[in-house]
Amino acid sequence: MSSPLTPDICIIGGGSGGVRAARVAAGEAGAKVALAEEDRYGGTCVIRGCVPKKLMVFASAYAPMVDEARAYGWTGMESGDFDWGTFHGKLDEELNRLEGIYRRLLDNSGVQKFDARAVIKDPHTVELSTGETFTAKHILIATGGRPLRPEIANAE
């Protein structure tokens, strides 16, 4: 199925680089922009790396604080067990909030979003996993990278 969309640029990848490129091209340069992302907007740092790690560190800091607070006169405070399910729910809530910000920024810039995997068929044609194809003057690949996992003991 072909789309009547003929953007000036199609960006593949909705991480930090792809979202920024889309917003600049659409909002500042006035280009017609299509952006395809197969997973979640925000990329590795926001969805899988920096933000989740910081929230885990933040959550882990509470247990020692209870003991320290008691030493400074706080009463009625108890140490407890960590509930991974509760934490994971709060983590998902925050990641959904951040992804929503990325989506709204794209919408407000006039970027047409496609929640689908994109494949380059030729120098100007993109095919989505939905079966839709369209032609763009330019295609920008902003799919990020993959982590290098060293082959050493306990690397996982």
Please annotate each region the language model reported:
Residues 3-17:
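Beta1/beta-strand and adjacent pyrophosphate-binding region of the FAD-binding site
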Residues 17-24:
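Short glycine/serine/threonine-rich phosphate/pyrophosphate-binding segments
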